[in-house]
């Protein structure tokens, strides 16, 4: 998709989706890195989407699904809402039934499994099921890159962890496009 058209479409949907996600995460007192409102992280994920989404987005209708995925990808896991809540929120935001289902499937696919450790939560089942949902692996890459950039910026111990995990993460995520995003992740 043309980059300019993608960004114009993204801007059409971003404000309302962002506001709804902010309310959801704020309602459970969720923060990013202890002191930042959680919307800080979600904006960073949407920023990666803005950089690379045009390379994978197939239709104009898919743009709002991707924006929704960027802003709601952690909502089931962290904001105490269910898959059905996600469907309803997408509907309230004007999504068609099919768009609502696709948006909810992305969010669900990015919801970690139950587990005591990071490895338990991001297990084979998690990646296998994620790869079945259109755009879910791409959205996970946006999330991972946003987290990594923040770890570098703040000199967090997670920087080392993300670097160590990256080769296995890229193998398990199972995508090679968009090439620029994959190159950035591979270079970490």
Language-model segment annotations:
Residues 1-188:
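Active-site helical microenvironments for divalent-metal-assisted chemistry
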């Amino acid at each position: 998709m043309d980059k300019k058209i993608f960004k114009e479409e993204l801007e059409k949907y971003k404000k309302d989706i962002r506001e709804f996600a902010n309310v959801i995460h704020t309602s459970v007192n969720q923060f990013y890195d202890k002191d930042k409102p959680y919307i800080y992280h979600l904006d960073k994920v949407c920023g990666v989407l803005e950089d690379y989404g045009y390379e994978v987005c197939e239709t104009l209708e898919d743009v709002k699904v991707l924006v929704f995925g960027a802003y709601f990808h952690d909502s089931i896991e962290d904001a105490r809402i269910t898959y059905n809540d996600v469907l309803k929120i997408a509907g309230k935001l004007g999504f068609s039934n099919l768009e609502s289902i696709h948006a909810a499937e992305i969010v669900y696919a990015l919801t970690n499994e139950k587990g005591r450790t990071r490895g338990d939560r991001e297990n084979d089942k998690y990646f296998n099921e994620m790869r079945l949902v259109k755009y879910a692996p791409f959205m996970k890459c946006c999330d991972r890159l946003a987290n990594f950039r923040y770890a570098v910026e703040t000199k967090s111990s997670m920087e080392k962890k993300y670097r160590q995990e990256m080769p296995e993460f890229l193998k398990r995520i199972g995508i090679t496009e968009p090439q620029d995003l994959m190159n950035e992740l591979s270079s970490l």
